[in-house]
Amino acid sequence: MNSKSNTQAMETEKIPRLLARLAIPAVVAQIINLLYNIVDRIYIGHIPGVGAAALTGVGLFTPILMLINACAMLAGSGGAPRAAISMGKKDNKTAEKILGNCFVILLLMAVALTVLFFAFAPQLLTLFGASDQTLPYGVDYARIYILGSIFVLIVMGMNPFITTQGFAKISMMTTVIGAVINIILDPIFIFVFNLGVKGAALATVLSQAVGAIWILRFLSGKKTILHLRKENFKLQKEILLPCLALGISTFVMLSTESILSISFTSSLSRYGGDLAVGAMTIITSVSQLATLPLQGICQGGQPIMSYNFGAGNRDRVKKAFFTQFTACTVFTGCFWLIMLLFPKGFAGIFSNNTELITYTAWALRIYMAGIFSLGFQVACQQSFMALGQAKVSLLLACLRKLILLIPLIFILPHFIQNKVFAVFLAEPISDILAAAITTATFFHRFHKILNRK
């Protein structure tokens, strides 16, 4: 589909069909993107003799990984909606300035993060709960991954600009190409070359590098609507700051995910040791099977809402939201049921250690008890972003994790005898409370936002 027909589709195509056309590739891309981490952990968990310790050590790198992702999405999730709104106003020149400024800030963040995390990886992993047994595996994985973080930032930060132009399939191919390469290289580097966790990290970095090249070639080519141009690489405060202001909510969500991961691993290390931390490593991967497809659905809905909001098409904004809302809630409802029925099957994917599988299955049922409500929160919070409501989106991004979940992780063990159970129970309580508050806030403000336009 060419750029003109993409623009016409945003204005005229039936919303359910348009959302499906944009969201399905985005969901597939998110699931495939998840394979970067899941495939690593599956292979690492099955390294003979050291699988459980290696898996736990690599899992302790999660907070750093999430912070790198957060920095990428600061530019991507903030810049892409701003670009879409400008496109809706037929102002592609400003949209291209947004693209160029976001690209440069991604490069600057890559340099800063590489220097910081490479130097302090051992100290940070120890702070997160690494033991003498698991620390070497975490450091080996972290340092190689960190050296390739520039590719991660380009892939995650620039890909939303492809989706927001209506090129969902091109966006999906970014992650498909990288994931396929990662799946092929992982067993070769880990087992054939006997590189262990270093091989897993190297495979991930190389696959992300290919994805970054793919994105840059597309955004510099003829098919894209918005082009990367050198003249737009000069940072402009009036262009960049509104993007970062809008993206800060996603940045906070992912950054608090990092703080949350530290809170979980440090508490579980204290109350349950390496076994509990290993279970949390698996749970983190399984939970992404819910959160990443939700993000994919919202990535499909975001350009529709943003474009039509910019164009003043209120009815299409409403239809896009309610279609997205329904898709998110149906998905999380189904996921909740599957988790309650088959937790052991999911745990067994990541390890052949019977004790770890049994422990993780028990923890999964507790942790996932409120996952059905997550669709409400994500659909509403992401819709605030699509409509340019940065402050409200930021507050709601903080609500679930920073205001509710993290305090509960430390408070509940003081009131419940089984300390590990108390730590896991904090998750469903915060899920349900945050969903109720976010949904009520959105429906209270939605019509007011549309009527102000």
Language-model segments: residues:
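Transmembrane alpha-helix boundary and packing residues in multipass membrane permease domains
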Residues: 26, 30, 42, 81, ...
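Transmembrane helical elements of multi-pass membrane transporters/channels
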Residues: 21-40, 144, 178, 207-211, ...
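Small-residue-rich hydrophobic transmembrane alpha-helices
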Residues: 55-115, 152-171, 279-337, 341-343, ...
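N-terminal transmembrane alpha-helices
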Residues: 11-50, 63-78, 82, 107-114, ...
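Small-residue hotspots at the loop-to-helix junctions and early N-terminal turns
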Residues: 52-63, 138, 142, 201, ...
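Helix-terminus/linker motif at the lipid-water interface of multi-pass membrane proteins
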Residues: 31, 35-55, 125-132, 188-195, ...
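Short alpha-helical transmembrane segments in multi-pass integral membrane proteins
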Residues: 1-23, 83-150, 194-247, 305-370, ...
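Short runs within selected transmembrane alpha-helices of multi-pass transporters and secretion channels
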Residues: 76, 145-163, 171-179, 200-213, ...
